[in-house]
Amino acid sequence: VAAAHTTRSSAGGHSFPLDFASISFLIVDDQPFTRRLVRSMLHGFGSREVYEAASAAEALELARGTMPNIIITDLMMPDLNGLKFIKMLKAPSAPISRIPIIVLSGYLTKTAALGVNEAGVDELLVKPVSPKALYEHISRIVLRKDQANPPTAFVQNQRRRAELHKKKAGDLALL
């Protein structure tokens, strides 16, 4: 599978390569099969950095520690309602509040869709998801961020992640 894909820009109709190797992801789903499937798709797109969490609590800890560029989450989790989880991620005081979120759910009512939109979700996908649909939704997020913020949230997150990695490397050197 090719590591670089192209997508269409809605602005000018031009194609541009989407470099998945520079985008990190956090997949949040209590179903191991779903996490493996999404991870496989992301690796197929060329992504190298994919984290997984089986619960909201684990995801919050991972998000704070790794600063992923995009979070892909289910709504139905054993430890916390998905909407509450999203609101915790998007709390204005949280450093992770600017991370784009894709909801990937097998059960999405109109009420739930309205709720997640109001909570600040960037994209909604219904399970089962195809690689094409996942790719298109990720591309839309990247395109929006690139158009909206010249130093994008992606760049800011990359800087934070580099600082975290540097700190971890320093901590390991002390051992």
Predicted regions and their residues:
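CheY-like receiver
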Residues: A3, S9-L18, R140-L175
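Acidic catalytic/metal-coordinating carboxylates
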Residues: S55, N81-K87
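A Lys-centered signature of the CheY-like receiver
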Residues: K127
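Acidic, metal-coordinating helix/loop segments flanking the phosphotransfer/catalytic sites
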Residues: E52-I70
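Two-component/phosphorelay signaling modules centered on CheY-like receiver
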Residues: P32-Y51
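Receiver (REC) domain active-site loop signature in two-component systems and cognate sites
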Residues: M77
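Alpha4 helix (beta4-alpha4-beta5 surface) of REC/receiver domains from two-component response regulators
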Residues: R39, K84, S97, L108-E123, ...
